[in-house]
Amino acid sequence: SGSCEVKTCWWSQPDFRVVGDYLKDKYDSASEMIVEKHRESRGWVETLTPKYTSFKAPTERDLIYYDSSPNFCNPNPATGSFGTRHRKCNITSHGIDGCELLCCGRGHDTRTEKRREKCHCIF
């Protein structure tokens, strides 16, 4: 007769919001890189170097990119993008639905509507 001890360890994922905020911070501080090809004894080798040397070199945990994002403001039939012209925007928002970002600096039109509706009020 012996004793048995059970020990269980596990990792749990943080809340989805925490992960999203972390990734957004990484995205916002991603470093643009230049792909340089050069020949070595083992063949062609590609190396990544920072495009802007005034910035700190990225670490293993930083996000990097070497292709700039397309301009989503203007229509692009090749990618199927319709652009953002004539889209509805939220004038009070500073997020992705806000007029400042969504209208790409082109300005925006404001439309005021008057509606007459039955409210089914009981007095």
From Swiss-Prot:
Disulfide bonds have critical and distinct roles in secretion and activity. Loss of each conserved cysteine results in high molecular weight oxidized Wnt oligomers, which are formed through inter-Wnt disulfide bonding. Palmitoleoylation is required for efficient binding to frizzled receptors. Depalmitoleoylation leads to Wnt signaling pathway inhibition. Belongs to the Wnt family. The keyword Cell membrane does not apply. A lipid is attached at residue 1 (O-palmitoleoyl serine). SMART domains: WNT1 (SM00097). This is Protein Wnt-3a. One of its GO terms (molecular function) is frizzled binding.
